[in-house]
Amino acid sequence: MTSMASLFSFTSPAVKRLLGWKQGDEEEKWAEKAVDALVKKLKKKKGAMEELEKALSSPGQPSKCVTIPRSLDGRLQVSHRKGLPHVIYCRVWRWPDLQSHHELKPLDICEFPFGSKQKEVCINPYHYKRVESPVLPPVLVPRHNEFNPQHSLLVQFRNLSHNEPHMPQNATFPDSFHQPNSTPFPLSPNSPYPPSPASSTYPNSPASSGPGSPFQLPADTPPPAYMPPDDQMGQDNSQPMDTSNNMIPQIMPSISSRDVQPVAYEEPKHWCSIVYYELNNRVGEAFHASSTSVLVDGFTDPANNKSRFCLGLLSNVNRNSTIENTRRHIGKGVHLYYVGGEVYAECLSDSSIFVQSRNCNFHHGFHPTTVCKIPSSCSLKIFNNQEFAQLLAQSVNHGFEAVYELTKMCTIRMSFVKGWGAEYHRQDVTSTPCWIEIHLHGPLQWLDKVLTQMGSPLNPISSVS
């Protein structure tokens, strides 16, 4: 029996040849099985093996798509592990540290990119590029308080706060979402994206903006340049900021480089910290994330992995039976990715997670306090640095209070298993058994530097309106 098994355990010459281009030295057996599974598929297609070898041996040269059939859920299983095929083979042959499909974008020459939802999917690793973090332009803070107090957004923000419902509204992903750039995974074919309910609109968001709104942003265009060219600085006839559709009103007066102090964004050592709560009690120490890929799960991890925050390790003498039962259902929890200046949350738990992110709500045109339900196996973009940068650059021209208000965008709340809001009997996140609060250090530190540069508020921050 052993001799029979050994006859079939050898590595074929084609697999050995392809493994010669493998990157990294980890998970040899897994990579071998992944390549072996691919070879079996490609041998059925004339010229596919040759095209793949050509792409791997000559990275700088043009190559054709190398495709395999798309599975029902879009994923491929290799040795008890499921993953997206283009991610698997980009990891084998280009980037061994690749974590997620959010880190990849197809090149224009690719005819069968993963995101196109065709019957075939291209796995040519040189038909994809890795997403790079965008360079955020510095915010130009006036050296003197030259903005008109009448232009302050404080009144608008106070009115918005007063109009916030006692209970947050709710939205379910993807049913309540209409932005196609945040697709659920896996996505069923021809999935409809109904418009979000008008009653849950975030005032002046990309999805709902009034004329002349300082927060009027195009939803899917890159941020405008904030630094005027040197030859235009100080001229009286300075032009509005260049945008793709001229939707953003001119909010920067004519200024010279001597009148403003640029405040640049700096990437911190830890991109976020995560604090765990049970009801209204904080449990354990804060977790500081240095890895761009973080798992928050309900298990224990004796190895003390720096990319895992294991809630199963944390004890609480005040824990009741509801909390105990909820903790048992957290399971694999949530996977947080920080990629290309964007934060994604992927629900790995069998139960849904519930997210309150003002940045995400702003993008989708929801009310600021809306709680979004993310079902199992779905992922959602919950923060976008570039949109935040636009808001910050514009808020500077409307006073200290408008900038200070953006601190609320830098904190994201997320509950496991149990939701809260208008559609649930729990009205507040502190009524849910198990939840976390995520603090985004980069945006918070940027805000702090801008506020320091701006000096004192025109109207002192107060709990009394």
Curated annotation (Swiss-Prot):
**InterPro entries per the record?**
Dwarfin (IPR013790), MAD_homology1_Dwarfin-type (IPR003619), MAD_homology_MH1 (IPR013019), SMAD-like_dom_sf (IPR017855), SMAD_dom_Dwarfin-type (IPR001132), SMAD_FHA_dom_sf (IPR008984), SMAD_MH1_sf (IPR036578)
Report residue spans for region: Disordered: 163-243
Q: What are the residue boundaries of the MH1 domain, all occurrences included?
A: 13-137
Ranges of Polar residues composition bias in the record: 169-182, 234-243
N-acetylthreonine: residues bearing it:
T2
- MF terms (GO), sorted A to Z: DEAD/H-box RNA helicase binding; DNA-binding transcription factor activity, RNA polymerase II-specific; DNA-binding transcription repressor activity, RNA polymerase II-specific; I-SMAD binding; metal ion binding; RNA polymerase II cis-regulatory region sequence-specific DNA binding; RNA polymerase II transcription regulatory region sequence-specific DNA binding; sequence-specific double-stranded DNA binding
GO cellular component annotations of the record: cytoplasm; cytosol; heteromeric SMAD protein complex; mitochondrion; nucleoplasm; nucleus; protein-containing complex
Compositional bias per record (Low complexity), positions renumbered to this chain: 198-214
What SUPFAM superfamilies is this protein classified in? SMAD MH1 domain, SMAD/FHA domain
**What is the purpose of this protein?**
Transcriptional regulator that plays a role in various cellular processes including embryonic development, cell differentiation, angiogenesis and tissue homeostasis. Upon BMP ligand binding to their receptors at the cell surface, is phosphorylated by activated type I BMP receptors (BMPRIs) and associates with SMAD4 to form a heteromeric complex which translocates into the nucleus acting as transcription factor. In turn, the hetero-trimeric complex recognizes cis-regulatory elements containing Smad Binding Elements (SBEs) to modulate the outcome of the signaling network.
How is the subunit organization of this protein annotated in UniProt?
Homodimer. Forms trimers with the co-SMAD SMAD4. Interacts with PEBP2-alpha subunit and SMURF1. Interacts with SUV39H1 and SUV39H2. Interacts (via MH2 domain) with LEMD3. Interacts with WWP1. Interacts with TMEM119. Interacts with ZNF8. Interacts with RANBP3L. Interacts with HK1. Interacts with HGS; this interaction attenuates BMP signaling.
Q: Which family does it belong to?
A: Belongs to the dwarfin/SMAD family.
| Official protein name in the record | Mothers against decapentaplegic homolog 5
What is the native source organism of this protein?
Answer: Rattus norvegicus
- State the taxonomy lineage: Eukaryota, Metazoa, Chordata, Craniata, Vertebrata
